[in-house]
Amino acid sequence: MNRFTAYAALFFMFSLCSTAKEAGFLHPAFNFRGTSTMSASSGDYSAAPTPLYKSWALPSSLNLTTQPPPPLTDRSYYELVQALTSKMRLDCQTVGDMTWRHLSEMLFASWNSVKEVSLKAASVTLWAIINIWFGLYWTLARLITLFLWTFSIEALCLILLGCITSLIYKGALSLSEHLPVFLFMSPLKIIWRAAFSKRNYKNERAVEGYKGFSVPQKPPKSAVIELQHENGSHLGYANCIRLYSGENALVTAEHCLEGAFATSLKTGNRIPMSTFFPIFKSARNDISILVGPPNWEGLLSVKGAHFITADKIGKGPASFYTLEKGEWMCHSATIDGAHHQFVSVLCNTGPGYSGTGFWSSKNLLGVLKGFPLEEECNYNVMSVIPSIPGITSPNYVFESTAVKGRVFSDEAVKELEREASEAVKKLARFKSLTDKNWADDYDSDEDYGLEREAATNAPAEKTAQTNSAEKTAPSTSAEKTALTNKPFKWASGTVRQNKRQLRHPRRRYKRTTNGQNGRTDHHSYGGENQSLGDRGEDSEQGVSESPAEAQTKEARKAWREEQAKQFTSYFNAIYKWGAQEGGCPPGFRKCGHIPRYYHPRTRGETQWGQKLCQVHPELADKTAGFGWPKAGSEAELQSLNLQAARWLQRAESATIPGAEARKRVIEKTVEAYRNCVTNAPLCSLKSKLDWAGFQQDIREAVQSLELDAGVGIPYIAYGLPAHRGWVEDHKLLPVLTQLTFDRLQKMSEASFEDMSAEELVQEGLCDPIRLFVKGEPHKQSKLDEGRYRLIMSVSLVDQLVARVLFQNQNKREISLWRSVPSKPGFGLSTDTQTAEFLECLQKVSGAPSVEELCANHKEYTRPTDCSGFDWSVAYWMLEDDMEVRNRLTFNNTQLTKRLRAAWLKCIGNSVLCLSDGTLLAQTVPGVQKSGSYNTSSSNSRIRVMAAYHCGADWAMAMGDDALEAPNSDLEEYKTLGFKVEVGRELEFCSHIFRNPTLAVPVNTNKMLYKLIHGYNPECGNPEVIQNYLAAVFSVLQELRHDRELVAKLHQWLVPSATTKEH
């Protein structure tokens, strides 16, 4: 390597020397005489004698004789390389300078050429445009000149007509400046109203399936008045309310104002509505609030009533008033939910009801608008009163909200308030053509003037006492801030001081906090309800909270979340997961166990019942053949083995219908249930779970809980066996609320599609379901077989989750059972209920009369009953039922569908817990859980859909009992996995219909056995005796048509129960 480097260096030096001449090395500094030459053949260097400098070239001052420079061969390589490097740098610099100079000259010449060409091209282009443009004008001028020269008279006439037309137009515009706008906008307004307003809503009508009542009753404080046309015919209604500014005002629907006259039934006076001034008016919300001329309240004989604004309206019963033959009638209604910016109301109305108010006790909730046409909505809608600070709402902050929650979400309330604020500002800026409004004029009320003068000249001492009394008045817990409540300012900017001011509503605020005003029942300001959420979190809208309040709220939230986290860890610790030895029922596997918390006992016949049977042999004959089932884990496992085996046997032979068949049945079911379209839960209206909306949903869910029901697994571990222990504890209720919210949050985020039953529980998406034998009498044949009726009890948190997701739909089905195939809401306790049900059946079946239906029911309907229906429900049936529910949700969201899908996954893939703590995971999805919140609703709809799959034109069901069209193919039920039996008589819900008013219970003997062997009134406990007597009279009511049997039972059961001294 070193040798190669040396050779390369020598070759490089040789190349430099051989190219010295060509490289320009003949520089004067190196032009020595006698320069040496190199011999390529020998490689030796030879040098001539050292050249001598000329003597005249040396400086004259130097007298010393200089020595000639040594030859190049005597110099060192370093000096030679230095010289070569310097020579190369100078030559490169010279070449670079010459190159740059030539390149610059070339670029400059090119730039001058391009610039000259560009300027010449631009000049040519511009002159071309000028020539073309000028040519066009010149041509046009020549044509016009030729036209005028050829048609002189015609052109003159056209010019004169154009001038005359222009003068006429300017004159008409000066005479009526707004006439063109009016002529242009009027048709557009008519087209807009016809195309949009009347398309979405129409006249009032009766809600299909809703049965209300009407009684003669006057409106509260005579606050409802009639609106008439100019000719005296009926138009609508208006309602008098007391504003927070101290004035009275009328509230009515905006579409009722045109040409209306406010008419008093008492005095007969009429006041044109055009004399009322609107302080709030919204065509979109169809509501107007108007204040009237002086003394209008006295002329109409009305008083201002209290009202409730949109942000505080809750679900519950209501009423409205109408005039019928000159008499006021009160009609029932139900506040159901939200519909866009309105409130959906279940009520039966008719044309001319617009503007009538809906009342909760003596509080106005809103006014009737009409009936929505979109989405086949089966309810009327109510226009609500927006919250306008100082006018319809006070400048006070309340600490708590309605017990059952609000109808509107926070976003909807804010939107209503924003629109109301803009409308008020718009009206405040309004000026009439005279630049003065009637409200700016002073009233000529002499009495009021004297009253005002007296108030002005009042002694200072008395005024000071009054002020002192007001200051020392005890403040209520609902008042956080008492801001100045200023009167409303009118268009001119002046305060209307001359108007008679009513009593300041301070006392009303105090009554509100005590539950005497505002929302009664479902609208009360319940301070005890603060446990459900943060106090003040749903407080009066539009008032900002202080930093201290925000800090307190955050502290409560942190405490609630921490408590829920601790409780979750506590409950998770009781599970011992893992496979266990021993056999298990088919379709299940043992996946773990928990400690034993339940110790059910087998019931036996009571001494009281045995004594009655000995004394009354006829009673013994009636109750023979029944007995109490066994209880405990062994009985549960035995019955589970039998029912699970039958379930899987039917499932193996069943086939799932095709996609087209399922789609057809789903669409037909949605059409049959179209009257039950409801809103999605408030908590899932956004893309993420909303805490504020959840608070409203959970309030309603908690209110509907059965307090004496069991809490289930794992909450029984805490030692409170019933719902009451959690709901009525103000410390545990916030924890329960947070636990429910956390579960919904996990359901919205988890990937649950491929999870097993135990994984769903381990991930916190659901709880195990407690399995136990129902404590009711069984037939002896079932007792001998060991096939007991099993109950699957869902936990408290899962109950609340299901109620939050489905309570709107289930409650709507109960309210409107007359217009939907599902009948969970009807009863047969009275003859009237029996006749009402048969009338519904007669209309659906097409029978000419109820009598004909009862006499020849086989021609019009077919009563069927499914054996073991809960165990026969396949998972695809639950999926189709959920699809129907989603399609019947008006404002459904992806989050709502996600939560419902998670709930369906959990309910179809459950972990059962026996009484001894054994956990059994379901390996085959399906089976309707009997203790679920949706069991009655979903079973009824699945039963109807099964009839549709079998070709029935119509069907109605109550759980597994059904009445369906005669054209139903019963053989198709086997392919669906159902075992169906056809009744010989007209039977439905364990009752046989003998005639239009007679429904005889089928299980009379079973009821008697449970009555005499389920109670022991001889114990002497007053509560036991009271419950026994209530059960006796309930059974006698069911058997009311068999008077002979009722008389005997009354003699056998009632006297003996009260003879014991206690």
Curated annotation (Swiss-Prot):
<keyword id="KW-0511">Multifunctional enzyme</keyword>
<dbReference type="InterPro" id="IPR001795">
    <property type="entry name" value="RNA-dir_pol_luteovirus"/>
</dbReference>
<feature type="signal peptide">
    <location>
        <begin position="1"/>
        <end position="20"/>
    </location>
</feature>
<dbReference type="InterPro" id="IPR009003">
    <property type="entry name" value="Peptidase_S1_PA"/>
</dbReference>
<keyword id="KW-0696">RNA-directed RNA polymerase</keyword>
<dbReference type="GO" id="GO:0004252">
    <property type="term" value="F:serine-type endopeptidase activity"/>
</dbReference>
<feature type="site" description="Cleavage; by viral serine protease">
    <location>
        <begin position="399"/>
        <end position="400"/>
    </location>
</feature>
<feature type="region of interest" description="Disordered">
    <location>
        <begin position="455"/>
        <end position="560"/>
    </location>
</feature>
<dbReference type="GO" id="GO:0006508">
    <property type="term" value="P:proteolysis"/>
</dbReference>
<keyword id="KW-0378">Hydrolase</keyword>
<dbReference type="GO" id="GO:0075523">
    <property type="term" value="P:viral translational frameshifting"/>
</dbReference>
<dbReference type="GO" id="GO:0039694">
    <property type="term" value="P:viral RNA genome replication"/>
</dbReference>
<dbReference type="GO" id="GO:0003723">
    <property type="term" value="F:RNA binding"/>
</dbReference>
<dbReference type="InterPro" id="IPR018019">
    <property type="entry name" value="Luteovirus_Orf2"/>
</dbReference>
<feature type="site" description="Cleavage; by viral serine protease">
    <location>
        <begin position="204"/>
        <end position="205"/>
    </location>
</feature>
<dbReference type="GO" id="GO:0000166">
    <property type="term" value="F:nucleotide binding"/>
</dbReference>
<keyword id="KW-0547">Nucleotide-binding</keyword>
<keyword id="KW-0808">Transferase</keyword>
<dbReference type="Pfam" id="PF02123">
    <property type="entry name" value="RdRP_4"/>
</dbReference>
<feature type="domain" description="Peptidase S39">
    <location>
        <begin position="207"/>
        <end position="399"/>
    </location>
</feature>
<dbReference type="Pfam" id="PF02122">
    <property type="entry name" value="Peptidase_S39"/>
</dbReference>
<keyword id="KW-0472">Membrane</keyword>
<feature type="transmembrane region" description="Helical">
    <location>
        <begin position="172"/>
        <end position="192"/>
    </location>
</feature>
<feature type="domain" description="RdRp catalytic">
    <location>
        <begin position="859"/>
        <end position="974"/>
    </location>
</feature>
<feature type="compositionally biased region" description="Basic and acidic residues">
    <location>
        <begin position="551"/>
        <end position="560"/>
    </location>
</feature>
<keyword id="KW-0812">Transmembrane</keyword>
<feature type="active site" description="For protease activity">
    <location>
        <position position="255"/>
    </location>
</feature>
<feature type="transmembrane region" description="Helical">
    <location>
        <begin position="144"/>
        <end position="164"/>
    </location>
</feature>
<keyword id="KW-0645">Protease</keyword>
<keyword id="KW-0693">Viral RNA replication</keyword>
<keyword id="KW-1133">Transmembrane helix</keyword>
<dbReference type="InterPro" id="IPR043502">
    <property type="entry name" value="DNA/RNA_pol_sf"/>
</dbReference>
<feature type="active site" description="For protease activity">
    <location>
        <position position="354"/>
    </location>
</feature>
<feature type="active site" description="For protease activity">
    <location>
        <position position="286"/>
    </location>
</feature>
<dbReference type="GO" id="GO:0006351">
    <property type="term" value="P:DNA-templated transcription"/>
</dbReference>
<dbReference type="InterPro" id="IPR000382">
    <property type="entry name" value="Peptidase_S39B_luteovirus"/>
</dbReference>
<dbReference type="GO" id="GO:0003968">
    <property type="term" value="F:RNA-directed RNA polymerase activity"/>
</dbReference>
<feature type="compositionally biased region" description="Polar residues">
    <location>
        <begin position="463"/>
        <end position="484"/>
    </location>
</feature>
<comment type="function">
    <text>Precursor from which the RNA-dependent RNA polymerase (RdRp) is probably released. RNA-dependent RNA polymerase plays an essential role in virus replication (Potential).</text>
</comment>
<dbReference type="GO" id="GO:0016020">
    <property type="term" value="C:membrane"/>
</dbReference>
<protein>
    <recommendedName>
        <fullName>Protein P1-P2</fullName>
        <ecNumber>3.4.21.-</ecNumber>
        <ecNumber>2.7.7.48</ecNumber>
    </recommendedName>
</protein>
<feature type="compositionally biased region" description="Basic residues">
    <location>
        <begin position="497"/>
        <end position="511"/>
    </location>
</feature>
